[in-house]
Amino acid sequence: MKVIFTQDVKGKGKKGEVKDVPVGYANNFLLKNKYAVEATPGNLKQLEQQNKRAEADRQQEIDDAKALKEQLKDIEVEVSAKTGEGGKLFGSISTKQIAEALKKQHDIKIDKRKMDLPHGIHALGYTNVPVKLDKEVEGTIRVHTVEQ
């Protein structure tokens, strides 16, 4: 019997997958517990429409990320910090401070966890901070660290 899985079932199939399973297993377990629905032409068409919708949503996310990447190319974020002798910072500039400055100065909200800056910024001047905007789209933020 052909079924469309509505949930992941360990060892059998993932959500949205169409598979042939034994009739008893389908009737007594999958259909009864609503882990799957029978693969009728109507259900198959509905699955196809869901997949198209999901693909369109995913493409929209990628397009939005690419637009944000282009916007970030022309932006410079200025962050001020206390310094000691020789332009050395007290502490470091974290991704949290960069995200807050970006929101305040340019009204762009980016999650601090998407920024790739493992040790922070420890010196004055310009630093390019890589940002993972999407699985496929990566951009950079130009950060200018100035003395407070």
Swiss-Prot record:
GO terms for biological process: translation. It comes from the Bacteria. One of its GO terms (cellular component) is ribosome. Binds to the 23S rRNA. The keyword Ribosomal protein applies. This is Large ribosomal subunit protein bL9. It comes from Staphylococcus epidermidis (strain ATCC 35984 / DSM 28319 / BCRC 17069 / CCUG 31568 / BM 3577 / RP62A). GO terms for molecular function: rRNA binding; structural constituent of ribosome. Keywords: Ribonucleoprotein, Ribosomal protein, RNA-binding, rRNA-binding. The keyword ATP-binding does not apply. It holds the Pfam family Ribosomal_L9_N. HAMAP family: Ribosomal_bL9. Belongs to the bacterial ribosomal protein bL9 family.
